[in-house]
């Protein structure tokens, strides 16, 4: 994914640019970047739903030009938002490089929202258009630069067995960053409102979004972990079909195991598991594996503490949960302190 396939490969630009600059002993100055937009204030389609939880992440990654991996820390950010009330649930995923930290101010990011109501689901997504396939592509993109922004956008409505999808490539006067999410979401909604949607039938049993499918499998592993080791092992191989735009995918849980809580991990991260997933595109046959680590009990149950993804053979990306966790009001609190917000996965 599509969400992950969309969002994470852009970290390659920051990593490769950094590897090249270290040999020269110079780093270009990046313009100041404003603080992140608070999730509770973002004008997303699900803004009428109360924020239950907000969790933020730090992005790192590694590249392998030849035989050895080269790593770079703190080049980007991630954010997951849970919303919900009265039978409605929404997930928001924001991932990208931070132009203020990434070498040469590299700017690659994307945002996906899934807003599910009893009447149907809306999926809104936007990302920078660069999709580097090789290290050579990454270096060329980093050297060329671009003061204007170019983004792919999608607005899909899934209801009554039909996915109605509008897509568009949007250009902006300046290269909007991950901190400009609210601005870009407004532009995307306005632009796509005039694009005629294309209809695609959705077979019975197919879930209306990727994030919801991940949450469903995670919920299953949490229940299984509480039931015992045998129940957890039986979760392996479970698959959920979902639609994204006009295409069908299968999300498979290829492996899941209990792990030991790492030193320095939040005390709320109790009974953690490591789960391996694979996205399988039905049309092309392409496969995209990724790993999550998360607690199955306590205040962080169902919250990914580690996200790992390898979109290319030469690239690995990792997002680690920040030490603090955001409250429903958007302010950071200690991850080990009592929580009043409800985790929808618990």
Describe each PLM feature range.
Residues 1-10:
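Bacterial N-terminal signal peptides that target proteins for export
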Residues 6, 24, 66-70, 211, ...:
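Short, aromatic- and cysteine-enriched interfacial helices/patches
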Residues 9-19:
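Bacterial N-terminal signal peptides
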Residues 18-33:
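Signal peptide processing junction and immediate N-terminal pro/mature segment
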Residues 30-170, 219-346:
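Acidic, serine/threonine-rich low-complexity disordered tracts
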Residues 117-118, 175, 184, 194:
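Secondary-structure boundary elements
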Residues 163-165, 171-181, 185:
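An internal, short helix-loop-strand segment that often contains or flanks glycine-aspartate motifs
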Residues 183-236:
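Hydrophobic, aromatic-enriched interface-forming segments
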